[in-house]
Amino acid sequence: MRFIITVLLIFFIHTVQAAPVLKATISRESQVIGNDGVTHTSVFQEHMYRDQNNVWFERVLPKHHQHSTNAKNKPSHKHLDLSETAQHYFLDNKKSTRLNLVLPEDKTVIHLQTVDIEMLGLTNCWTCVFSIFDSRSVKKMKITQQGNGYTWYESQNAKNKIKVKWDNKNNLALIIDILSLNGQSYSLTKTHIQQVNITPPWTQYGKFISKEYADFGD
């Protein structure tokens, strides 16, 4: 029954899409200087695919990346590694945000509930994933520069100074530059749009094994 529901759900997702699919590469860099004087730096990339009702993120991993294995040298995701999963956000027929984690290597899809999303530190904010930065927040920011198809926004709160370069046509953030006022941390996100009108990856897991996040517990 769960398999049938999954197939029907994926079919619904595919049939409602109308807009072209957007593909982009997102580069994320962050740095934090701890109170102990140690600097922690994180740099990674993701591929993003998007249409009006679906957003898909997948981490760019090294070519020789080894998936988790058990004693018999077979893939094992008993303890889920989020870096190995693709994140498929989509709007259901009630326009509520849903999230599936997809393990292409294992041909498995994990259906997350709201409590699972919160526990994993993920988001269920549709505008945040669709536009990479919450478009509702952008509207409250000060415009500092306008160019050919883009707008620079800026704001400051008690902790951070935030600059956003916004793609007006595609409704997403091209650059997100966040610098703490005390100079101890920053994060920089850059989005490079590569192409449109491609085959979306979420059309390819309708026959995958369906699981719940609880299936990965101890």
Residue ranges and their predicted role:
Residues A19-V21, T144-Y150, N157-I162, K169-D218:
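Non-transmembrane domains of secretory- and envelope-associated proteins
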